[in-house]
Amino acid sequence: DEIQQILIKSAADLISLENPNYQYVAARLLLYSLRKQVIDKLWDHPHIYEHTKKCIEKGVYDPSILESYEKKDFDRMENWINHNRDYDFTYAGLRQVIDKYLVQDRSSGEVFETPQFMYMMISATLFAKYPKNKRMSYVKKYYDAISQFKINIPTPVMAGVRTPIKQYASCVLVDVDDTLPSIFSSDMAIGRYVAQRAGIGINAGRIRGINSRIRGGEVQHTGVIPFLKKFESTVKCCTQNGVRGGSATVHFPIWHQEIEDIIVLKNNKGTEDNRVRKLDYSIQISKLFY
């Protein structure tokens, strides 16, 4: 294995404008290493039904897939799956798929599938609830489209839709109201969705501005920045199932009381007290402005 890794690195180092085809040499070497780890062979892949059962036994695939499809359905998938499409990857593309999207134990580094198994299982999972007289044609068409790079899939779907922790939505909008129960409930929802691999959009425009009256003037509002810091901490304390760090975009209307402070929240100048740099921001403009 160490010799194989040296060969992969050597081929990758030779990739250049003058010798671009080394990207395929490095990709083939990396693919052979992956296949040896996953199936212990270079050419003879297991039947997709056996592969699925094995991954379910290891706890990395959702068992419901075997309840949704019969053995004859898996036989059709086996006829459609084309492992030679793995050779279409460049080195950079295959490396990204292995590092980010293949189901694996990120503690031990053990990988449980190859790219074509990944693509077929994604397709089968997405159409599992479709009418039985139509879904297999959808499975094939979608598999062909994604395995031949005709369409792209968002990270939450590509990385985990076939696992026990499903996440079909790549992005989730959390609408925050101007009450403490809503703000704290939204914070919990943000944390759970980030842990489920979703990107987050936060509509925080209804949170009132700094020094606004609360309970008839008994309390003055602390403003949006303390709550944004809370959201920032929640987003960054979780990763998207080990694939990448959480991310969120916060939306504010342009007429918000604190808009002048909001638009500089990512500015390098300023202190940690008045900056929230690890979130992204969007300013909403209505038709009154154009």
Label every PLM stretch briefly.
Residues D1-Y290:
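Extended catalytic cores of very large enzyme megasubunits
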